[in-house]
Amino acid sequence: MNFLVVGTVRNCEKNIFKTIKCIDKGLNFANKLEYFFVESDSDDQTLKSLDKLSKKKNNFKFMSFGSLRTNIPLRTERLAICRNRCLEYLRSKENSWAEYLIVVDAFLLYHLS
């Protein structure tokens, strides 16, 4: 079984490591497991944490839109941009291996940890 975990993240520096560890543990039976997160508008050290994870785990990828709130004040619109990027990533040929998709919302990062 091959899993792709995608999601949007914001201000998750305190919980992202525990969350990834929890997902890794729950999916330890997977033949292949990869992560792709899209970040925007974090006020903490989320980008540093994501970068650290991407260097530590070869199956962890992320991208950042930086600060979208200056030009796009509505959070729902910013989320739509980030989620659409997750969809683009999922649909890319390099991810045709994925059999199952797991979508993680940023608010869950707090509750899973």
Task: Please place each PLM-identified region on the residue numbering.
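Active-site-proximal specificity loops/subdomain of glycosyltransferases
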Residues: 49-98
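Hydrophobic targeting segments
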Residues: 2-7, 23, 34-37
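Short beta-strand/turn micro-motifs composed of small residues
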Residues: 7-9, 39, 105
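A generic structural motif
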Residues: 28-33, 58
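Short beta-strand-to-loop acidic/aromatic patch adjacent to the donor-nucleotide binding site
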Residues: 95-109
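Short, well-formed alpha-helical segments that are part of the catalytic scaffolds
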Residues: 12-27
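A conserved acidic beta->alpha catalytic loop
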Residues: 13, 38-49, 67
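Acidic donor-diphosphate engagement hotspot in glycosyltransferases and nucleotidyltransferases
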Residues: 112-113
